[in-house]
Structure formats: structure tokens, C-alpha cells
């Protein structure tokens, strides 16, 4: 993990960064558009909800968490034959990091709708992409990328927000007001009082004690369903029908 893009490609040790075959790239090439890239070009930015599926044909591209902030860091660097993105590309969530060109090259941009059509015709190709995206999401969760949740471990609302993130496999970092020294710095940066907590920082936006529905909308997830009312039923009588 570094704070500035390197030209060295990140090794694929877990299967999260597979390289597509020439045949797979050719199939995608028929459905997409080639684009030249220059160092510093942003292919998609954190928070973007509409992005193409990018395959690197030449050059290298870095996945950058927190681009433009003091906490900016490089998650991975990809070279020829690798594809970009993670699970959010398929779920409609805002992107959890930015993709930034490290050096000059060329990428293939395929609309997500066309990608879905290819996946439907080639299940093995779909399995490759889905497995890689699931592993990438796990990496983000392990790194504490994505959301920042600031709140007390004694707060029921803090537990609710953290449970929501965990249920939806969202990458997040929890800053405990009682134990994490950086929580105070974040609170001061955004002018947050203890009464405002828990707060959630998502794609640069501050949410004060958001409901699950508000948090879902900010992320790009469908609104969570309301809990169904339940009641007891009493059956009175006897006999085979129980009536």
C-alpha cells in the first residue's frame, strides 16, 4: 500500500486481479470502444454510479482510495489484460475508489449492459468476473476503505449503522469516539458534536445519524424493506381442523 501510484503492477496472489485471455478481450472488443489514456486521467471517480467496464490494453492504471484527500492511498496497480472495478459496478453502488492512469496507454470501455449480455452467453467468463469482484470487495473491507462511521460503541444507532454496512458487505472503517484518537480529528474537521453522532462519511458527504434508508440512498442501494408487523394467532376449538 502506497500513497502515490507506482508503475509496478500489483501481483495477483489471491485471484482478485486475473488477466483476460486474448479471446476474451476480442469478444469484449466487439462490444466496446478503445480509448487512449494519459498519466493522471481518471477513468472513474469515487462515488460514480455509472461507469463502463474497463479492460487495460496498454499502460497501467491504479486503483486509488481517497483520491485528493490527506488519506489518499493506492490499493493496486493493473497492467495489460486486467480489468477494473469491483462489486459496485454490478450492484449500482457508487464506486468505492477512483481509477487513475499511471502512464500512457489504451483501455477498452464496454457498457455494463453489453457486459451482462456477454456474461449471459459465457457463464465461465461471468464466474471469473464475479469471483474477482467478490475478492476485491473483501480486500476493501479488510483495508477499511469506503465509508467512515464515527460513533460510540455504546450507541444503539452506531451499532445499527455498522450492522447495516456488515449485512450489505460494504467496506467501512469505524472510528470509536472512546478509543480512536482520529475520531476527534474527523469530528473537528466536519464540525460534528457528540449529539450528531453517529455520523457517516460517504463519498465526501457527511450524514448525521442517518436512517438505513438514507444511508442506502447515499450509497446507491435499493431502499431497505420495512419490517413486517407480526402478531400472535390463537386457535380456539378442537377436532381434526382445530376449529
Predicted features, each with a name:
Residues 203-224:
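Non-catalytic, surface beta->alpha helical segment in thiol-disulfide oxidoreductase systems
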Residues 84, 175, 238-243:
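Gly/lys/ser-thr-rich phosphate-binding loops in alpha/beta enzymes
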Residues 227-241:
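Beta1/beta-strand and adjacent pyrophosphate-binding region of the FAD-binding site
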Residues 148-187:
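Short, thiol/selenol-centered motifs that function as redox-active sites or metal-ligating centers
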Residues 189-201:
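Structural micro-motif
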Residues 1-151, 155-163:
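Cytosolic regulatory regions built on CNB/CRP/Popeye-like sensor folds
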Residues 140-146, 222-230:
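Short domain-boundary/entry signatures in modular proteins, especially
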Residues 128, 139, 184-185, 218:
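Rhodanese-like catalytic fold shared by cysteine-dependent sulfurtransferases
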Amino acid at each position: 500500500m502506497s500513497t502515490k501510484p507506482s508503475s509496478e503492477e500489483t501481483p495477483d496472489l489471491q485471484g482478485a486481479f486475473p488477466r483476460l485471455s486474448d479471446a476474451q478481450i476480442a469478444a469484449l472488443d466487439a462490444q466496446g470502444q478503445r480509448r487512449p489514456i494519459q498519466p493522471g486521467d481518471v477513468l472513474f471517480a469515487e462515488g460514480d454510479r455509472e461507469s463502463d467496464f474497463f479492460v487495460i490494453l496498454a499502460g497501467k492504471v491504479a486503483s486509488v482510495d481517497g483520491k485528493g484527500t490527506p488519506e489518499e492511498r493506492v490499493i493496486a496497480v493493473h497492467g495489460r489484460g486486467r480489468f477494473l472495478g469491483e462489486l459496485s459496478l454490478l450492484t449500482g453502488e457508487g464506486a468505492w475508489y477512483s481509477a487513475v492512469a499511471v502512464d500512457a496507454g489504451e483501455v477498452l470501455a464496454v457498457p455494463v449492459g453489453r457486459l451482462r449480455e456477454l456474461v449471459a452467453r459465457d457463464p465461465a467468463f461471468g464466474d471469473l468476473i464475479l469471483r474477482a469482484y467478490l475478492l476485491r470487495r473483501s480486500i476493501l473491507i479488510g483495508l477499511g476503505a469506503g465509508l467512515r462511521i464515527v460513533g460510540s460503541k455504546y450507541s444503539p444507532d452506531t451499532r445499527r449503522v455498522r450492522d447495516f454496512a456488515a449485512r450489505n458487505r460494504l467496506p467501512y472503517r469505524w472510528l470509536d469516539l472512546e478509543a480512536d484518537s482520529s475520531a476527534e480529528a474527523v469530528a473537528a474537521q466536519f464540525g460534528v458534536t457528540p449529539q450528531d453522532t453517529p455520523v457517516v462519511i460517504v463519498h465526501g458527504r457527511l450524514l448525521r445519524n442517518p436512517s438505513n434508508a438514507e444511508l442506502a440512498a447515499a450509497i446507491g442501494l435499493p431502499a431497505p424493506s420495512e419490517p413486517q408487523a407480526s402478531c400472535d394467532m390463537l386457535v380456539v376449538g378442537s377436532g381434526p381442523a382445530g376449529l
